[in-house]
């Protein structure tokens, strides 16, 4: 059985590959990357490295050839670009006879008002249309997304948010990677939708948990979206990023990530890493 992971040199993709290598021979594993030179270390460990670029569909036919089980990791970029890139990958999977597609989606994708949901809605629909058995891994929110705020808190800054009492199912990328690996090698995942959500917490509860890890109080600063935009600008975020980060706060406030589910533990076969332990890992990583 040949398994392929796209975006295998990215933050999530590299963790999925490492998770797979713990229990699977390297000879069963193929990675598809835009720049094969970046995957030289994997090649040296016996993993087959192929070039695959979501912007160049002709490269994907070669990349996906002979693959049984495929993980499409959602790309970065604006919504329109991502929709086209993902469509290219899905069509190539169909052309090359891939037998199973796992795809990293977003929480509650089909009903989500999250500004990042449209590419996931389009991609899930495109995969279903192929008739290929699938599993949608609806990843809630990476704890790593909060590293900037964690660094600020370590340096003495307050935890700034305009997300109000909106709840998030934060978890470590490693947990999401382990879940993806489990679906790629496990049985019974055909035509499934998994809501991969950690225990739901508000921003205040996350800041309190971080304070427990750091051994100090972290003041919470609830602001308006307009104030949040100004603060982000003052921290040096580029102008084009500001509406995105504000939109994320707004969608959290409106409950787009408030998805309660035990799918994560079911897929992992273990509990999600507890939030204090997860925060401790990130704090150690930063310092």
Predicted regions span which residues?
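Residues lining the SAM
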Residues: 6, 73, 104, 269
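Compositionally biased, low-complexity linear motifs
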Residues: 64-69, 283-287
